[in-house]
Amino acid sequence: MAAPTSKLTPDEDSIRMMLTAKVHIGTKNVENKMRKYVYSRTQEGVHLINLAHTLEKLKVAARAIVTVSNPEEVVVVSARPYGSRAVLKFSHYVGSHPIAGRWIPGTLTNQITQKFIEPRLLVATDPRTDAQSLRESSYVSLPVIALCDTDSPLNYVDIAIPCNNKGKESIALMYWLLAREVLYLRDQLKRWMPWDVLVDTFFWRDPEQFEQKPEETVNTHDDDLLTSRPTVPLHPLPDWSTVDPAHANSSDWKVMAAGHEEWGSFVDTRAQWQ
């Protein structure tokens, strides 16, 4: 009798995508609790993550997200800029509550603030950059799922997904895989059906690149106008040192007067007041 296959068997296609996005590339430092997820170490001292554990923990995290009946009670945070777009896209397809950017202190503990929320699950991109949200979650006994690198502290983290949480490609792929697995478990997407959403839509994009493109087009247009401007033919300037023969013998300037022979011929027509 053949042994039953485990549901947490790593998918070869997902593993191949992780290798392409460099999800397995860790750091030179390693936390003691993260050593069990390290596969090996390179000659440069960089620790490599075992992607089998990564995919296994990712499926466990997806099951924890599905257990929350109201998707809006799942908060996904990312203080790291590379994870802001991935968090927004993940929340768009899953229905969670995204917080991209700076975490406002007191979001989970201060009921007076307008941003106060009471979620049931927290998903963090980096335990170091999202330390404030993890600390507040410990005050309210909120379970936490986090993308953890080899040097990430596991304080206040309940489910750690070992991966590279510093590269924009790695962060985007991890949120894409997590969103797809959540849709699988919710039966909104069949496992034999490919997801029509590309991983590229989760990538972080620099807004300065979009601001430079219009300027470049305007400059090229101005250059075309300058190069295509018609040239005006240059006529030779007249030589003022030469004398017109028609006026060569006209020494009397009285001829230049407007129909008058002498300047004294003008009659003063003003009234005599005396």
Swiss-Prot record:
CDD domains in alphabetical order: RPS2
One Pfam family linked to the record: Ribosomal_S2
Keyword Transmembrane assigned: no
The UniProt record lists the keyword Glycoprotein: no
Domain of life of the organism encoding this protein: Eukaryota
Molecular function (Gene Ontology), one example: structural constituent of ribosome
Keywords: Cytoplasm, Ribonucleoprotein, Ribosomal protein
GO CC annotations, alphabetized: cytosolic small ribosomal subunit
Location, primary (coarse class): cytoplasm
InterPro entries membership: Ribosomal_uS2 (IPR001865), Ribosomal_uS2_CS (IPR018130), Ribosomal_uS2_euk (IPR027498), Ribosomal_uS2_euk/arc (IPR005707), Ribosomal_uS2_flav_dom_sf (IPR023591)
An individual GO BP term: ribosomal small subunit assembly
Subcellular location: Cytoplasm
Record family assignment: Belongs to the universal ribosomal protein uS2 family.
Binding partners and assembly: Component of the small ribosomal subunit. Mature ribosomes consist of a small (40S) and a large (60S) subunit. The 40S subunit contains about 33 different proteins and 1 molecule of RNA (18S). The 60S subunit contains about 49 different proteins and 3 molecules of RNA (25S, 5.8S and 5S). Interacts with ribosomal protein S21.
Role played: Required for the assembly and/or stability of the 40S ribosomal subunit. Required for the processing of the 20S rRNA-precursor to mature 18S rRNA in a late step of the maturation of 40S ribosomal subunits.
Protein name, per record: Small ribosomal subunit protein uS2
